[in-house]
Amino acid sequence: MVRNLFVGRLLVAGSLVWAGSALAADVTLLNVSYDPTRELYVEFNKAFSAAYRKETGKSIEIKQSHGGSGSQARSVIDGLQADVVTLALAYDIDAIANKGFLKKDWQKTLPQNSSPYTSTIVFLVRKGNPKGIKDWDDLVKSGVQVITPNPKTSGGARWNYLAAWGYGLKKYGSEDKARKFVADIYKNVPVLDTGARGSTVTFVERGVGDVLLAWENEAFLAVKEFGKDKFEIVAPPLSILAEPPVAVVDSVSDKKGTRAAAEAYLKYWYTKEGQEIAARNFYRPRDAAVGEKYADSFAKVELFTIDDVFGGWTKAQKEHFAEGGVFDQIYKN
């Protein structure tokens, strides 16, 4: 039954919104999030709602919207009334801020640049790893099909792309060689889904591909739900430190009078319980004590940052993912 519920969530296309309770609440928030956080926020919202009622005496309902991070950001810009956004990468929230919906220094509002947990990119392979995939180099081999979403719509896909580029740059020593390496990976990609969850469906349910480039939490969730007899996780020795951020949407929360609740909601991530929830859902917690408790859950991977290798998200977005950027050039060819 658990598996069927997971599959049901997997097969929902596009942005999904649901309420935590059928009863009218004193406060209602809309959290616009990225694709593979659905299960995470089921647990987080339940815990926060209980804590909020205990603290304030008021009931709160959290509605969720999920989809590719870039698409979700555009939905907020186009009028989706998000009280908070919890997206895959800072650039997508910057895009919302640049339209005046929240202050441009929003990352200074909460600790760790408003990223309460981290993740990385790993490989999900079929049981027994029949293609012997162990590192990024294996993704360019003839006969290996790689599943990854479209970086024009998916934040996870951009992390996948940049992780591969960072590996290529370190191993081969030049931007030109890194470009060729990443281009060769995309020659092995048969389909680009719009979001990370869609790519999981393609790989897990439809049986397409030999390896899924995945958020670490998404890979763990697939193994948990479908079994170690079906899939296994390969953590490459080198990958990227992914820092999914969170922010209150000032214009919406002020208009709706929900700012206090929205701020409390995001601050709850930094409590012991919030960090425990992140870790239980296979995200790497920021809190050192919680991180130590769950240390054995996560592979030891050398992680590089987007700032160190790419000069930050603004530069990476412009160079690689803007119209006519490097991704467009290599994917066309």
Predicted regions and their residues:
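N-terminal segment of the mature folded domain
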Residues: 25-154, 331
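Sec/Tat signal peptide C-region and signal peptidase I cleavage site
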Residues: 18-24
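Extracellular/periplasmic juxtamembrane helices and adjacent flexible linkers that interface
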Residues: 253-333
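A bilobed periplasmic-binding-protein/Venus flytrap-type ligand-binding module shared by bacterial periplasmic
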Residues: 121-129, 243-260, 277-281
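Ligand-binding pocket segment of bilobal, Venus flytrap-like solute-binding proteins
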Residues: 171-237
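Bacterial N-terminal signal peptides that target proteins for export
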Residues: 1-11
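Short helix-loop capping/hinge motifs at secondary-structure junctions, enriched
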Residues: 128-134, 153, 166-174, 252-260
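Short beta-strand->loop
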Residues: 32-34, 125-127, 145-171, 185-189, ...
